[in-house]
From Swiss-Prot:
PANTHER family: RIBOSOMAL PROTEIN S15P/S13E, SMALL RIBOSOMAL SUBUNIT PROTEIN US15. This is Small ribosomal subunit protein uS15. GO terms for cellular component: cytosolic small ribosomal subunit. InterPro entries: Ribosomal_uS15, Ribosomal_uS15_arc_euk, Ribosomal_uS15_N, uS15_NS1_RNA-bd_sf. Keywords: Ribonucleoprotein, Ribosomal protein. Residues 1-20 are annotated as: Disordered. Part of the 30S ribosomal subunit. It comes from the Archaea. The gene is rps15. SUPFAM superfamilies: S15/NS1 RNA-binding domain.
Length: 153
């Protein structure tokens, strides 16, 4: 079954570049230390990328270090247990479920929850296949409430 809506195409394209830009003054080791410090402060991988871009002038970690940001976090043992995109979907589903508890006749929200949970299952299957999630991992809405509330990230 196809997705209900196609993904948007409106965004800027990254320039094709093999190495780090000339104007970046950080070395590979300095960038890895910055990533580690920000992760220890509790920032998510996407937030770390935004902070590095906006405050330190580092456009892409991979151009400087040769490794993706999540790979650096995995090497340091700071990677999240559940991939960030899956965790965000779980949190979104928990919020919609909470809304439905207060407004049980909201049919649009019910349909939206079905779509979100379908997306969670598809993404979980992918992460199980590539080995980022254990094979026995299963999405359960009750446990998702605990995850989304910040019990584990």
């Amino acid at each position: 079954m196809n997705k209900k809506r196609p993904n948007g195409k409106s965004h800027s394209t990254r320039p094709v570049r093999s190495g780090a830009p000339k104007w970046v003054r950080f070395t590979r080791e300095e960038v890895e230390l910055l990533v580690e410090e920000l992760a220890k402060k509790g920032y998510s991988p996407s937030m770390i990328g935004i902070i590095l871009r906006d405050q330190y002038g580092i456009p892409l970690v991979k151009q400087i270090t040769g490794k993706k940001l999540t790979k650096i976090l995995e090497e340091k043992g700071l990677a999240p247990k559940i991939p960030e995109d899956l965790f965000n979907l779980i949190r979104k589903a928990a919020n919609v479920r909470r809304h439905l508890f207060e407004h049980p006749k909201d049919k649009r929200a019910k349909k939206g929850l079905e779509e979100i949970e379908s997306k969670i299952r598809r993404l979980a299957d992918y992460y199980k296949r590539i080995g980022k999630l254990p094979k026995e991992w299963k999405y359960e809405p009750e446990k998702a409430e605990l995850l989304a509330s910040g019990a584990a990230s």
